[in-house]
Amino acid sequence: MKLTTVTNVSVDGVTQGHRRIDAGPRHETDAPDEDGSGTFERFGWAPPLLDDAASTFISQTFQRADAFLFGRRTYEIFAGSWGAGMDPGNPVGEALNTRPKYVASTTLTDPRWADTTVLSGDVAGAIGELRAKPGGELQVWGSGTLIRWLLDRRLVDEIVLLTYPVVVGQGTRLFPATGPDLGLDLVDLLSTPKGLTIQTYRTTGRPQYEAATA
């Protein structure tokens, strides 16, 4: 299976606080890894820009997954909403409730969401085994800390970015100031009426750099 990450991100790269997870029913994109504590105050920058085209893309992407991989916090958010029977019949919930789920965690010992496997110990090795299996897609939603960990170990095959036309100006960003370098091939590009761009990239290893000239 190819490992695909799917992330809501602002133009300046912020992933934090794209929704207020404590306000109203949770939506299928409520998967922030960071809870916005401390000085962050600009919650909810994504919903005013989410349109039907983006929502359709999100639903279709969930439905094509063969399995899901989460960090603990994102897993608990999903388990507390979709896993608790929110919005019965929704295709997102159907995918999440009927397909295998894996959680990278050293502290979660008793997952109560059916068909969940906790990955601890040699997490990189376990994820490598999942990637080696035949099939379609192992998807990572939200889980920013996990995504950065996966990128550090070059375990990501595809990166999907839902880029919202807003500069948040503060908050945790998907890509840190210092991290691994990564070459990308653009394999799909969509835009929506409210100005989201949805880019799908295939990772290609380390990028090429211009050679120094005399």
Where are the language model's segments positioned?
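Conserved catalytic/dimer-interface elements of ABC ATPase nucleotide-binding domains
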Residues: 160
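Portal/gating segments that form or line small-molecule/metal binding sites
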Residues: 1-155, 165-214
